[in-house]
Amino acid sequence: MNSVGEECTDMKRDYDQCFNRWFAEKFLKGAGSGDPCTELFRRYRECVQKAIKDKDIPVDGVDFMGPSKSKTESDGSS
């Protein structure tokens, strides 16, 4: 599948290959302490964010996944 930005498609492919290789060869075998693809993901995410902005795609109300976001809805306080 191509990326939202044509200029990001190669980065997406590189990240997908890196992640799939790490997942199959390390994580599923219990040797997955850390994701070696973090930098590829960061560059791809930045490219996608730029493409969304450049194409003026509305994203209001959309939750984005990523290491900088965390859900605190169920923090145990009532």
From Swiss-Prot:
Disulfide bonds: C8-C47, C18-C37
One of the record's GO molecular function terms: phosphatidic acid transfer activity
GO BP terms in the entry: apoptotic process; negative regulation of intrinsic apoptotic signaling pathway in response to DNA damage by p53 class mediator; phospholipid translocation; phospholipid transport; pronephros development
Residues the UniProt record annotates as site (Important for interaction with prelid3a): F27, F41
Superkingdom assignment: Eukaryota
Gene Ontology cellular-component annotations: cytosol; mitochondrial intermembrane space; mitochondrion; nucleus
Main location: mitochondrion
Xref: PROSITE patterns: CHCH
Keywords: Apoptosis, Coiled coil, Developmental protein, Disulfide bond, Lipid transport, Mitochondrion, Transport
One Pfam family linked to the record: UPF0203
Reaction(s) the record says it catalyses: a 1,2-diacyl-sn-glycero-3-phosphate(in) = a 1,2-diacyl-sn-glycero-3-phosphate(out)
Domain CHCH span(s) in chain numbering: 5-55
Motif (Cx9C motif 2): 37-47
Coiled coil: 1-52
Motif (Cx9C motif 1): 8-18
Compartments, as annotated in UniProt: Mitochondrion; Mitochondrion intermembrane space
Entry keyword annotation includes Disulfide bond: yes
Family: Belongs to the TRIAP1/MDM35 family.
Quaternary organization: Monomer. Forms a complex with prelid1 in the mitochondrion intermembrane space. Interacts with prelid3a.
Main function: Involved in the modulation of the mitochondrial apoptotic pathway by ensuring the accumulation of cardiolipin (CL) in mitochondrial membranes. The triap1:prelid1 complex probably functions as a phosphatidic acid (PA) transporter across the mitochondrion intermembrane space to provide PA for cardiolipin CL synthesis in the inner membrane. Likewise, the triap1:prelid3a complex mediates the transfer of phosphatidic acid (PA) between liposomes (in vitro) and probably functions as a PA transporter across the mitochondrion intermembrane space (in vivo).
Protein name per Swiss-Prot or TrEMBL: TP53-regulated inhibitor of apoptosis 1-A
Organism the protein comes from: Xenopus laevis
Lineage: Eukaryota, Metazoa, Chordata, Craniata, Vertebrata
